Each structure stands twice: as C-alpha cells, then as structure tokens.
C-alpha cells in the first residue's frame, strides 16, 4: 500500500528531516550511467555568450558551469583538482550550420585529415565543405566548493587558451615533494588544489577573457 505524504497545516512551519532521505541515500541515482548524465563544462563567459541573456547578474569574464548553471565571478575564481588530461582534435561544422555538436573527435594517435590554414588562422579540412579542426586540451577536474564538496567537470582549453594548458601541465610536472626519507618525487597531477580566475586579454584581432591559473594548496585528504 502506498504511503501517504504527511502534510503540514498552514499554521505550522515545515522542517526538513535530512535523516528521512539519508536512510534511502543513493536510491534512483546511483545506478545512472554516463549515457544518462550531462557532462558539466566549465567555461569563461564572453561578450557574445548566449548565456548572458538568460543568467541574471552574469557578465563577461564570469565562470559558468553548464550543468548546475552556477556562475562564479572571475575575480573570485573557483578551486579545482586536476585529475586527468587528454589532447583532442575536434572537427567542427562551419559556424551557423549543423547541430552544434562535433562532426568528429580525434584522440591521441588517431590519423588526422589533411588541413589548410585559413586567413582566420583556423585549420580547415581539405575538401571538408568548410569543416575545421580545433586542437583542444581537455582537463578533467573536480570543482571544490567552499564546504569541500566536489563535482566532476570538463575544462576545455583551445585557441588562445591552449598555451595556458601547456603552462598548467608544466607547472604540475614541476612540483616536487619529499617522502618520509627525504627523497624528492613528483606527485600525481591530482595532488594539489588550483585556483582558476579570469583576466582580460587582447591581440590585434580583438579582446576576450581568459584563464589565470595559480597553485592554491596541497590536497590533504
């Protein structure tokens, strides 16, 4: 027999009992697979970002989570743990056409199609009807909130930000720690917290907001 939900009278103040949910922790969500979930991306909002039309108070230079819809001010930044990295070449349809999804994704070791550099510095696929390849550094991170709770996210870095990715990888590899015997070793990439902020950038082609990455502290647990 179905259990009826208890209702409070209008004069009573409803108080949530977390233990009621804790007893059934994970039911209905733990069995979800990757095909059932959206991938959260962390991105810097730009002047022409569509999200600015829908997010109250958001502005160019803010940091946006595409799944939670959370916005962090660029000057405040977010804290992340960098867990993994891969380099991909993503083949895109011409702007304004297609579904907005990649035409094809090439991983490390995949044979890339022949390309020609266009006047806009994009690498266009030869006989690809305007499709172009974009070299993209994919950083798989855990975003850490002020309470220490983490959430998985993907942080792509391409175009003007690709250099930032290389610098970040170099900074992680340069970290040295000492073991109990005083011997130096290189810790894993997920050993430290990093702060991601945003800064204004420009070149002869225009201006935008990009990442500013700094080491925060070592992961304690």
PLM region spans:
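Long, compositionally biased interface segments
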Residues: 173-221
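Polar/charged alpha-helical tracts
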Residues: 43-46, 50, 170-174, 180
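OB-fold ssDNA-binding interfaces and closely related basic DNA-contact patches used
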Residues: 1-150, 203-210, 216-220
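Short acidic, glycine/tyrosine-flanked loop/strand segments centered on an H-E-D-like triad
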Residues: 140-178
